[in-house]
Amino acid sequence: KLTVGAPTIHTVLAEAGKTIARRRNAPLTIIRRVVERLLSLNVMEVLTASMIKKNDKYTYVQGTRFMDHGARNYDVAGYRLPSVTTILGRTKDETYLRQWIAKKGKEEAERIKTQSATRGTSMHKYLENYVLGKGYEDLTELGQLTKHMAQKVIEVGLAPVSEYFGSEVTLYYPGLYAGSTDLVGIHNGKETVMDFKQANRPKREEWIGDYKLQAAAYAMAHDQVHGSAIEQCVIMVCTPDLYYQEFKIDGLNLRK
């Protein structure tokens, strides 16, 4: 009999291993029961089975985010700094955005914008709690959708991540800018700044210039304050229909 106190994939497999060792004459029966047990586990139980280790190599300070005249700013380490997103928003060409709003209509464009932001926040909550090894559940329709989006990111995007230095990390470049990145850790053996993004549809490389600039700015800030040598940035994108994409910035592209 398989006995599992707090069922997760790892506890089920561990118990199954012990049972198979005791009953070598009936492995197929046990394996079938293990598969049935795994299928009975919901996605939330998978989401709490984080295998990413905490590494305290870097010590991060917690910044306070505030709005000033509609712009996001940070109060961190004695500095009051504009956010990276605020700077990018004020310097980018908004021609396409204006055309999109004109095509969709102001009301519909605002609805899509709000929906996307809410979906992104929900997906981030699942991912943050997964990294920290905490349980999190949102039983709303939106929460159930973003649970599966987060699971896709975990299965594909976070699989190469062996350790993390910090989750939801406030980063700042003294006197210039600040921001919050989703994860800093070891990705495929390299110190990496990682950002999670939701998207309404798959992205093309040429559409994500701001994502790249944002991630690169975080890497520069990390190196400046913590004396690190961030080797790459990885941007993990997932759509509501679970299409996953990954964009990397490294080498000269990260430093230029």
Regions found by a protein language model. Give the residues of each.
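Basic polycationic patches enriched in arginine
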Residues: 22-24, 32-33, 37
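Metal-dependent nuclease catalytic cores that hydrolyze phosphodiester bonds in DNA/RNA
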Residues: 38, 44-178
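Alpha-helix boundary/capping motif
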Residues: 9, 20, 30-31
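Extreme N-terminal basic, low-complexity initiation segments
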Residues: 2-9
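Mg2+/Mn2+-dependent nuclease catalytic core
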Residues: 165-256
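Residue-level detector of structural "landmarks"
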Residues: 12-16
